[in-house]
């Protein structure tokens, strides 16, 4: 089966293989009803800012990944997708209380990556939380094709500093479920 480079459901998706993609997954029910209708007049960039601010505010919907075990499960699955499954090369990620930001160079089609990771983490998290028959993740993702190195650096900074911006930690590397924490650990190991 050939991977689709472009398709639309509720949101447009550009997903060329071998390109860097900025992806956001959110928990089901994490945005207030009518959120997208209120954003129809905004540009794509302004829609994303409103989307991310609403998620970071933590005022709507479930916050399953506030639970350290669930956040670790998702974080470990993201790393496993890179190191063991070879689905992508991960450049940055963060697991927040109700959403995940991920920056990858896709080796496999994004549809496959999303299906495998969201499916696995949903099953495991729902089992851990003693939930059955309920959606864990929203069925669609926000994704953006990163087009140049300046945008790449800006997005890495944005992702890794999301917990700081949300007021959860003072320093990005203090958030355990992010690539910033991994970078700090690797630096410490190299110094030793």
Language model segments and positions:
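Short catalytic/metal-binding and nucleic-acid-binding patches
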Residues: 1-192
């Amino acid at each position: 089966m050939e991977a689709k480079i472009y398709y639309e459901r509720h949101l447009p998706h550009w997903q060329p293989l071998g390109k860097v993609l900025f992806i956001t997954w959110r928990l089901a029910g994490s945005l207030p009803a009518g959120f997208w209708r209120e954003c129809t007049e905004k540009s794509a960039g302004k829609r994303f800012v409103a989307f991310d601010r609403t998620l970071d505010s933590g005022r709507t919907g479930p916050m399953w990944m506030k639970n350290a075990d669930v956040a670790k499960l998702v974080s470990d699955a993201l790393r496993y997708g890179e190191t063991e499954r070879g689905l992508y090369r991960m450049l940055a990620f963060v697991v927040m209380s109700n959403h995940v930001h991920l920056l990858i160079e896709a080796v496999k089609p994004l549809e496959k990556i999303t299906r495998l990771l969201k499916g696995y983490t949903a099953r495991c998290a729902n089992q851990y939380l003693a939930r059955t028959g309920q959606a864990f993740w929203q069925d669609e993702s926000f994704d953006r094709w990163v087009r140049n190195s300046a945008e790449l650096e800006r997005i890495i900074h944005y992702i890794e500093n999301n917990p700081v911006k949300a007021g959860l930690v003072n320093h990005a590397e203090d958030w355990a479920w992010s690539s910033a924490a991994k970078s700090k650990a690797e630096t410490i190991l190299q110094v030793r």
